[in-house]
């Protein structure tokens, strides 16, 4: 596995992490790279756009059907999609039952033991990042993923999740080789979003790898179960994903040990950028509205 790059995309649920990762990986394969995607999100939507299909059967689902994971063959769980990209979904239990992270651990061990990592240039883990619990931290903790890319936006909860993920990376950075590759901002058109993303990246001792502009063509492609790279290869949005892929490809060995900030520092930063308002500002705005209404 010499030369194998193991990267991971982390981010809060609903941030567009799976869409961003699949579009980026589709652009990477166009650079001549051989890729294996390991979906580590219980929604099992990490490979849908690459396979042009509904969510594929997961390792945990198939293992339960066959009796145990030892009863499976790699061919049972691995599907091949756009330009030869290999796809696996680890899956998770029913909501409220058991640890979804266990599926991640089971899947990665099974794939490694059965040669799925042979003959690929990249293994990409697509990981839920609202919580960095034991199972979801597994690609970091077990030194599987060496480069972590955090997908975020200018929204407060996305920034909060990004900082939390940085804490998880820091915890294992010194015992293993894991590093923060950078932040990817998926534009939500919030106030001063680019400035805020760059400021957070700097505070985390990292950099903003790419700012992905919002474009409805992403949704149009998703409705057809396709990446933008496949659906509209000549579009400006496809060019954005190619630029992101180029930056990740050139980023080998450039990752950093992150420096997460406190909740107070995060809130101060949001206040500085005018994203979060002080009680005094909110009261002044309310009084101004009431005065304007009274004057009518």
Swiss-Prot record:
Binding sites annotated in the UniProt record for ATP? 11-18
Among the Pfam families in the record, one is: Fer4_NifH
Could you say which residues bind [4Fe-4S] cluster here?
99, 133
What EC number(s) does the entry state? 1.18.6.1
Q: Which GO terms describe its biological process?
A: nitrogen fixation
The entry's comment on post-translational modification says: The reversible ADP-ribosylation of Arg-102 inactivates the nitrogenase reductase and regulates nitrogenase activity.
Give the gene name. Answer: nifH1
* Protein name according to UniProt: Nitrogenase iron protein
**Source species, please?**
Sinorhizobium fredii (strain NBRC 101917 / NGR234)
Q: What class of enzyme is it?
A: oxidoreductase
**Keyword Glycosyltransferase tagged:** no
